[in-house]
Amino acid sequence: MLIWFLPLFLLFLMIGLPVFFVLLAFFGILLWLNDQGRDGAMLYRNIYNGIDSFPLMAIPFFMLAGELMNRGGITLRLVEFSQAMMGHLKGGLAHVNVLTSMLFAGLSGSAVADTSAIGSMLIPAMEKQGYTKKFAAAITAASSVIGPIIPPSGIMIIYAYVMGESVAALFLAGIVPGILVGVSLMVTIKFMAKRYNFPAVTKKTTWSQRGKASLKAFFPLMTPVIILGGILGGIFTPTEASAVAAAYAMFIGLFVLKSLEWKEIPKVMTKAAMVSSVVLLLVGAAMAFKTVVSLSHAPEYLAQFVLGLSDNPYILLFLINILLFIVGMFLDAGPAIIILGPILGPIFVELGVHPVHFAIIMSVNLTVGLATPPMGLVLFVASSVSGERVETIAKAILPFLAVEAIVIFLITYFPAISMTIPLLTGFAK
C-alpha cells in the first residue's frame, strides 16, 4: 500500500507544498490506514516526542552562533582573510568564495546560511570583477554544500540522534570529506579560469598583509577549534559545545571586535529562533512520519527489496548513492535522514559498512542534493540573493555538481577518507 504513496509524496513536494504539511498529511493518512486514526492525540504526541531530545538542543544554539557571527561582521573578516590568501590566483574571487564557505562551515553548519551570507557579499563583487552573474551564483550554491559537512553540522546531529551514533565521531568524520569537496571545486575553478580568462582580484599579498588579515580573522577562526577541541578533550558534550559557541560568538561580537551592539541581540535571537523552529518542526514531523511508516512494516519490505537487488555491497552502495542524490533534490536532508536512515543504515552495517562511514555517505549525498536541479533549496536561495533565474543557475552549476558527484564516490569506496580521524582519536571503533 505504501508504495503507491511515494509518487504522490514526490508530486506534492515538486509543486511546492511545504515539507512539514506533506509529512503530516501522510502521517494522518497512514495512521488511519493502520486503524489508529481515532487517536487524535497521537499526532502532537509524536511531534513532541520527536524533538524532546537533549542532543537536538545543539541545533538552535549553533543557529544562534551562526547568526551572531554573521550580524557581527564576521563574514566580511573571513572574506578578507580568504582574499589575502587566494585573491592573487586566476579566478581569485571564485577561489575566495569556496575558501570562505569552508571557513564559514565551521561557524554555521548550514548551506542556506552560507549561500545567503556569502552570496550577498561576493556575488555582486564577482559581477563587478567581470564574472557572469550565473557563474557567481552557481559557485556560491555549489560551495555552500560544504556547510553541513564540515563540523559543526546540524544534519549530523540529527543523524546521531536518530541512529544512536556519536556526534563527535560524525563531526570528525566530516572534516576530510568537507575539505575534499572544497579542494575539488578549487581545482575545477583553476581549469575554468584558464579557459574563460577569469581575473585575479589583487596582486600577490605580502606575508605582512596575510598576517594582518589572519589577526582580524583570528577570533572567528577559533570557533571551530574551541568546538572540536572541547569535544575531543572531553571538556564538554557536543550539545554543550553549541552553547559555548553561541556564548563565544556573543562575547567576541560585543566586547572583543565590538562589531555587535546590545540592541541587535533581540533581532539576532528572534531570527535564530525562527530558523531553528522551521528545522525542529521538520524534525518533529519526520519523526512522526517515521513512527507510522514503521507500523506499516515498510522498512522490512524495503530492506528485503534492496538486499534482493544484489549481495555485493559495492553495487548496492552505487545504487543507494543515486537514490540519495535524487531524494536530496526534493526532500530536505533532516527529514530524509530521519525517514531513510533507520531503513538503510542497518542494511549496510550488515553488509560490512561502518555505521559512521555510511552516515557520511548519506549526509554528503543529501547535502549535495540541496544544490541539485530542479528543486535544490540553495538554488532558490542563490537566485533570491543574485536576482538570476533558477534555470540559468541550474545550467551553470552542472560542472561543479559533476565534480562533487565524483567526490561522493571517492568517499563511498575509500572509507579511509572519512574514517581515519575518528578511528585515530578513538571516537569510532
Indicate where each model-derived feature is located.
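Alpha-helical transmembrane segments of multi-pass membrane transport proteins
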Residues: 1-429
